Amino acid sequence: MRSGDLFQLYIKESHILRERVSSLVKAGWQIVNFISSNISDSASLEAEVIRATDCPWPLPDEDAWWTLDVVEEIDQWKDLSQGLFVYVSDFDGLIRSSPAEADTLYQHIARMQDRYRWERLRDGDEDLKFIYGFECSEKNLPLVREFFRGHVVVVDRFDPEHPELESAEALGPFAEEYPHLPG
């Protein structure tokens, strides 16, 4: 994990994630949802990356690391002009059942962030919006905080009229732990 990253967590019981996804879909965003219960090993992680990204390419006979290339190429078959929202359902379940695959899936999302946020900004394309988050149950919040070494914020609300906006005000009860965030 890169220092300075803050990972957005959505508490499963709050339904905020479902409402945000619905608002983003209405605004024309592309949604990639990795479903943790579909992942148990490298082969199932590969299949889940293909499923979640709607990748039109067939699965090659290689290990999971080739899918890092797939997540960088989504813009070849999806229209990302309005934005891209990536989230992992039941991430706490994946951490508990397969911590190595949870780490590998996180690396895929980090690669997507590099490609669709940082590279685009560096190249002067400030219009592409990229947001990602992880869903977990409230009871397993400590487990997920530990996985991300405490660098988390809980999304406790969003503006349905502007679901793409991220700010310190939109961050949950741990926001006071990150005073360096803009207000």
Residue positions per predicted region:
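N-terminal intrinsically disordered, low-complexity segments enriched in P/E/S/T
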Residues: 1-59, 75-183
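A short, well-ordered alpha-helical element
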Residues: 64-76
